[in-house]
């Protein structure tokens, strides 16, 4: 029994009919498309896809899905920037993107040491007596002569003088009750004035 060796199996025939995709990496094709288009405003996804289709003869059926995925990944990693739905290469001379909010102020070494010393001093319990209220007295100069107090007025100290205790000799006896009046009861008001008696001279 003879076999035809020139015919392969059905699976080999089917695999030979499938197109083989030997494509460069998508990030490489995307960067080449943006550089070739050279648009100062960037390129959108549709323009990049059309440029890749014009340069590559065979593309996989999921070409747009793969293109969207790689564009998103390149934007996250900073390889591309997106401005108004257009992709472009970042400017190498541009300053780094500033984050939100006010940047923290960098402390110098002296400020850091002072802050650390303040924290340590606050944790140590102070053994000094508590400071009284008010302004502390001004320190006296030992070279200055002592100032004498100037007494003005009568020299009497302020305030009410202390009450002096009474002695036995100064004790005043209580007045005796007035004797009961035996005469007529005195009426109210001022008593009438008594007129003086005029004595006639003798021999008139």
From Swiss-Prot:
Short motif Nuclear localization signal 1 (NLS), span:
96-102
| Segments forming domain H15 | 22-91
Which parts of this chain does the entry mark as a DNA-binding region?
A: 97-105, 130-138, 155-163, 183-193
Q: GO CC annotations?
A: nucleolus; nucleosome; nucleus
Composition bias (Polar residues) maps to 10-19
Compartments where found: Nucleus; Nucleus, Nucleolus
Q: Where is this motif: Nuclear localization signal 2 (NLS)?
A: 162-166
Annotated spans, Disordered: 1-23, 86-204
Q: Name one GO biological process term.
A: nucleosome assembly
The protein's UniProt keywords, in alphabetical order, are: Acetylation, DNA-binding, Nucleus, Repeat
Known tissue expression: Mostly expressed in flowers (especially in styles and filaments, and, at lower levels, in sepals and ovaries) and developing siliques, and, to a lower extent, in leaves, cotyledons, lateral roots and root tips.
MF terms from GO for this chain are: DNA binding
Task: Assign the protein's first listed, main location to one coarse class.
Answer: nucleus
PTM summary from the entry reads: Acetylated.
PROSITE patterns assigned to the protein according to its UniProt record, in alphabetical order: H15 (PS51504)
Question: What residue spans carry the Basic and acidic residues bias annotation?
Answer: 138-147
List all Low complexity biased stretches: 114-129, 195-204
Q: Which Pfam families match?
A: Linker_histone
Similarity comment text for this entry? Belongs to the HMGA family.
| Function field | Binds A/T-rich DNA with a highly dynamic distribution into the nucleus.
Q: What is this protein called?
A: HMG-Y-related protein A
* Species assigned in the record: Arabidopsis thaliana
Q: Which gene encodes it?
A: HMGA
């Amino acid at each position: 029994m003879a076999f035809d060796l020139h015919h392969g199996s059905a699976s080999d025939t089917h695999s030979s009919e499938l197109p083989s995709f030997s494509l460069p990496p998508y990030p490489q094709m995307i960067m080449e498309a943006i550089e070739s288009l050279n648009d100062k405003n960037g390129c959108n996804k549709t323009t990049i896809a059309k440029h890749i289709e014009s340069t590559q003869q065979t593309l996989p059926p999921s070409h747009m899905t793969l293109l969207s995925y790689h564009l998103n990944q390149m934007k996250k990693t900073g390889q591309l920037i997106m401005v108004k739905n257009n992709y472009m290469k970042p400017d190498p001379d541009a300053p780094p993107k500033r984050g939100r909010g006010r940047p923290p102020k960098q402390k110098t070494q002296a400020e850091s040491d002072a802050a650390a010393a303040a924290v340590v001093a606050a944790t140590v319990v102070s053994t000094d007596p508590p400071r009284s209220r008010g302004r502390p007295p001004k320190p006296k100069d030992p070279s200055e002569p002592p100032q004498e107090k100037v007494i003005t007025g009568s020299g009497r100290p302020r305030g009410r003088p202390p009450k002096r205790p009474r002695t036995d000799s100064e004790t005043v006896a209580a007045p005796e009750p007035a004797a009961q009046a035996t005469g007529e009861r005195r009426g109210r008001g001022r008593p009438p004035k008594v007129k003086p008696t005029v004595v006639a001279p003798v021999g008139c």
